[in-house]
Regions:
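C-terminal functional extensions of proteins
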Residues: 201-244
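Glycine-rich phosphate-binding loop
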Residues: 141-190
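N-terminal amphipathic/basic leader segments beginning at the initiator methionine
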Residues: 1-47
Length: 244
């Protein structure tokens, strides 16, 4: 788990930071623009943040609608940042810890094409799951750095489990930003991965799976079901945008 979802600190943001707030197919979409000055007070990277909020009905009965809404935002980001080179998806976290498994679960449903040199019309997609430092003995940052230096992608997409201090956001929000992630967990490096780290455009996808109360982390009793649905929604959205 890494940073909290931006919505946790939204109330402390100035009103003009909320660029747009719309509702589509029962999904609330909030677009925030964070500046370098804001970073000093809320400790979030500067950039564009899109937060999707939804209820049980959307997640369980209308996931196709949720995917369509998500695809619109992802399409905008891909059009802006993907210039035809390799896209490197990085699934942060551990598949063995349910509350930290969103990244690996999403990547498990994505299509990897980077090795298919004969199919020139296919977008080049590479997948990498570094696992946690206590499993590998190597910091996640160092592993990612080696892969980035080898592949030289033109876009990095990080996928990770987030935390939240507001129970209403647990399992019912999704964040997409073009800023990055700071490894706040003690099991990982304290280094951050942002678009400045490797001088490569970067997207970050975060799903809050753990509720932080004081120094305790709790998860929802339906977490496994919700994780399976959301990981499929996110992966399917990317697969359709890249390969359909």
């Amino acid at each position: 788990m890494n940073r909290n979802i931006l919505l946790d600190v939204a109330e402390s943001l100035e009103k003009e930071k909320l660029i747009a707030e719309t509702k589509e197919k029962d999904v609330m979409i909030r677009h925030y623009l964070i500046t370098e000055n804001d970073k000093k007070t809320i400790h979030e990277e500067a950039g564009d943040y899109f937060v999707f909020s939804f209820d049980d009905m959307v997640l369980y009965e209308e996931k196709e609608s949720l995917k369509k809404v998500l695809k619109k935002t992802l399409k905008t980001f891909l059009k802006k940042y993907h210039k035809g080179g390799t896209i490197l998806f990085i699934g942060l976290g551990s598949k063995n810890i349910l509350g930290d498994s969103f990244g690996p679960k999403v990547l498990n449903n994505l299509i990897a094409t980077n090795a298919y040199n004969d199919f020139l019309i296919l977008p080049k997609v590479a997948l990498f799951t570094p696992d946690t430092t206590n499993k590998t003995g190597i910091s996640s940052y160092k592993l990612i750095e080696m892969v980035v230096n080898h592949l030289k992608p033109d876009l990095i997409i990080l996928v990770d489990s987030f935390t939240t201090t507001h129970f209403k956001n647990l399992n019912r929000t999704l964040e997409v930003n073009d800023c990055g992630i700071c490894f706040a967990n003690q099991l990982r490096s304290n280094k951050e991965i942002t678009r400045k780290t490797f001088n490569i455009p970067l997207l970050s996808i975060g799903y809050p799976t753990m509720f932080k109360m004081h120094k305790t982390y709790l998860n929802h009793f339906r977490l496994e079901k919700d994780l399976n649905i959301m990981s499929e929604v996110v992966a399917s959205a990317f697969n359709e945008l890249l390969f359909d």
